[in-house]
Amino acid sequence: AKNGYRIYNEYHVELIRTAKVAFQVEVLQSGLRAMMRELIKALAKYEFASATALLHDYVLAIDQEIDEANEAIHIVEDMIKGTTEEEDISLKRSEAAKYIGVTTDALRNWELNGLLLLKRSENGYRIYAADDLKRLKIIRILRSAKYSLEAILRLLHSIDHQEEHDVRTILNNPEPSEDIISVCDMLILSLEKAKMNTAELAKCINNLKKVAAKRFV
């Protein structure tokens, strides 16, 4: 406007509503949030074909994330039921990191976050025994599937106390006492909600098409 104020027309209002739906679930993994940003940018430029293609790719990416999260659960369930191999194994941190396939910094971070408590050898070295390595494999698999440290800690706490555990339920249901809850603390539920939102996003894109068509008649 001449006085410097922004003028919002019907299209802008619908675009803001669409953005609200797009960012309702803060899923960050695999560039999902970035894809939503690109979708909104495309709609802002009236590029409806690009926006529709991005939405399609977004659904495929979510499906892949859900599959990986579920696969991790199945692997962990089998590991929990299985027996520990190489009972007499004893490794130092660098050896354990190589054995598990992670960095020593990752191990240190997991220890600092309470996921693992280690014994020390007589000369003061941290020692990773067979049970520790099994635990580390569980952590690595779940972290690779993008579960949060808090969610993994819930599961490990259940295992430590020999409680009956439904792995999927524990990983995706934060305790009421947890102060801060992120989408990765309930990963599969968040991804499923994000996928449900795509139906609403498709409607939003169609509405924007109609509004744009009226504007440029």
Regions found by a protein language model. Give the residues of each.
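Major-groove DNA-recognition helix of helix-turn-helix-type DNA-binding domains
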Residues: 1, 103-124
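Arg/Lys-rich, alpha-helical DNA-contact motif
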Residues: 2-92, 130-217
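Append "Primarily bacterial transcriptional regulators
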Residues: 8, 97, 110
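Polyanion-binding surface elements
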Residues: 86-107
